[in-house]
């Protein structure tokens, strides 16, 4: 059984309608858990639009905690695969089925992400190394001219985004999980209200399973990261990244070093760098 979940918080109507259409068109998704963290339960009405919807009006406990709630309910109902969705997505009807077929054929994969593109169809570079504090500083606070070389490596821009890759950090906007893998790592770490939960869960699954970028299908990610445009959300982002580095280590993180080294070696980064591919 394939299940899915989305978390809402005062989400615009057009976004919800767009992602719901994508889910409904994906005939293989048997249940969709809509976790609504909004102050009111206005979205309760959508439960009447389809028999697959399970609506929960929830206290705003955060992104990861809300998806954990959905995944616990999904596991109780026998789900074997679960898709964590952002509400700002649009995708074709074959995407989920194709990812399911891939996971069925590769039992060593615990988490897969399709190609992610923006509204214009341009690739978003969302396959990344496990971040260090300096990666965050370069990305957030320095001019693009300073951060270009760092991003080239950190976001694996030197790699071919038309080819499958094993990656230790996959974006949280579309996460296709093997339920067994999620249960093994006990889901998202609920200490993180939002933002680093995708880094954290990918690296924990990566320890036991392959975590794979699979570009044969793609998803439209329609809106930019809110923390780039909102001082309030930037503050939330930074607070949660501090919690992340307190958990895993600011300077000394041997697992980060190991995962990144293995990833760069598999992608032949040294030879590509020598060849001047940028």
Language-model segment annotations:
Residues 11-25:
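Short, well-formed alpha-helical segments that are part of the catalytic scaffolds
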Residues 34-44:
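A conserved acidic beta->alpha catalytic loop
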Residues 58-77:
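Glycine-rich, basic loop-to-helix element that forms the pyrophosphate-binding segment
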Residues 79-90:
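Short beta-strand-to-loop acidic/aromatic patch adjacent to the donor-nucleotide binding site
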